[in-house]
Amino acid sequence: MDPIDMYRRATDGAIAVMRAVAPEQLELPTPCAEWSVQNLIDHMTGSTAYLRASLAGQPPSPLSGTSATDFSDGADAAASALMEPGALERVCMSPLGFEWTIGHAVMGTIMDTVIHTWDLATATGQSVELDPGLVEMCIAMFLPEMPERGRESGLVGAVVAVPEDATADVRLLGAMGRRV
């Protein structure tokens, strides 16, 4: 599967949820401890800035007060920059302080976007069906190692037990500390 296509699918799903957020919902809590809906939108928009800055060899700037439009514009700009020849092979610094390729950064951003799309929908009372192909990719690429590293750094909550016959999205969300 093409990482840029997967990135677009993940960001398109997030944009749909973000556009349905009402202004009065921005201060609501989310499943992400200590983050409001606005904080979560800022974080997600920041992920687009991270990719663009990493491609340019620069550190990203902190963002606040961002909107669905900011996220959409940032995702479009990141996707365009990712199409440059050799972009996915460039090396950058991860948010956790280790070097990885832009291609790995894109995959990590997809995972982050998929999980946070669910967080945002849950916080604002929206129903969302996560893209099954993206969920399966996240499971194959990131479980179980990535959540464990995230827990060690305090970025991911404790595993939430799910039934043995749970759907793929529920298994992924449980591994990432979400109660479904």
Name every feature range the model reports, one short phrase each.
Residues 40:
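Extended, alpha-helix-rich binding/interface surfaces that flank or overlap catalytic cores
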Residues 1-13, 20-33, 46-67, 73-180:
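Structured surface interface patches that mediate subunit assembly and partner/cofactor docking
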